[in-house]
Amino acid sequence: AFDAAGFYLSGCCIWKKQSLVLGRSPYQWQHEPCLYGWKKKGKHQWYTGRKESTIWEFDKPKKNGDHPTMKPIPLLAYPIQNSSMANSVVIDPFGGSGSTLIACEQSDRICYTIELDEKFCDVIVKRYIEQVGSSEGVTVQRDGATFRFKEVANVDN
């Protein structure tokens, strides 16, 4: 799928978690694979040293009631900062809980994200507003129209 989408697969990094993820498997997972690559016709950039490891040790979020696969913001900020500069555009076609959006906000990147599940769209917007401290200037797009967040939600900010 990576190749069919026009991407070059450079490698697979491993997110090593501080605790097991309990499931039905005989062996319990304590890691998650993260594919790393770039558009085949695109330019590959690297903005850090050559001592970076494929093993990434970041603690799981302490709570993830908002989304079943919530990622810690530092986990996403790490590869974003390694492979982009400030004001670069980052595209996240699976918005989830908004961790990529928040990582981009914290590292001065521009993030375009999409999420199909409406309840997770609400999670993304609320987490983002908590991060920036206000809903001022926050817009959402629904059915092709753009709305100020205050117009579509009951927010005290």
Where are these regions (language model features)?
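Core catalytic lobe of class I
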Residues: A1-C121
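S-adenosyl-L-methionine
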Residues: V125-N157
